[in-house]
């Protein structure tokens, strides 16, 4: 395979050269423990504080509201488990949606086993949550609302500001999983009344194994990892200084390049969508047509199975996915696609292609040409398509 076109940037991204360069000294040269008192280590303490400030500035937050974690899944777990524990005397009801990442859904299920009640809101055909449904679900014992900023599979951007205003009006904590959105769209936690926000380094050309949880000052939240006094005694463990430098540098890069970078991604994404929808029949675009992440395209191709399509694409040097990378081993159709009303047999034929700023028009042309051949070949072997074609010809 000589050609490689990477279109799975929702799963992970390539670490940017400037990010890697910034990280390297903290592995072999400036490797001191930030908690030590000698100057060799205290330099690293200052560096960690500098990255915290960078991230806070990107969100319109304060630096003492940023807590470093091992990634988005940990941040989601911390937000739900530690706040529900802290506020359970006030109530034991949580509101979320049916299209959340499994880091939220599985944590919600865990909390249900421990006596909490969870309302899972429906979404519309585009994957949008209706803020009115959020407000209607609120009960006197509701303590937390968690709605993702943008969906990791279909790219739909949720009405976060409106939901935040509702939560704020009712005095309920509001958490958003912004793993896909951070670095792709502007976010201001004050404007959106966000109390907690999860993000991850490897989704914005940073390293894996590092993320953060924004926690608004005044929010009661229990310690998630017990031990030392790191992260203001809320998450014990020696700080991952190279990773923190990586996510801080990646954040700086993402904010500085956002306008130009996402404009190019959006242009290529729209070109991809136009060609696929015009040239491959019996295809559906999943997600909102306009309120979606600039690099996301998600399709369903009738009469074929997504895994077979991915294998053929891989043989052609194209990396895509049929849903979240966290559930790639599952044979079940995407819970997100089922939530937007697609039947199982159509949801099985899904393909998510997520771009980066390096993707060119020539790359898209190659992908679409390969996709046309692959879909045609797979439909030619499909009994469902054969039956459909016979009925169409009658």
Where on the chain are the PLM-derived regions?
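Pyridoxal 5′-phosphate
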Residues: 1-394
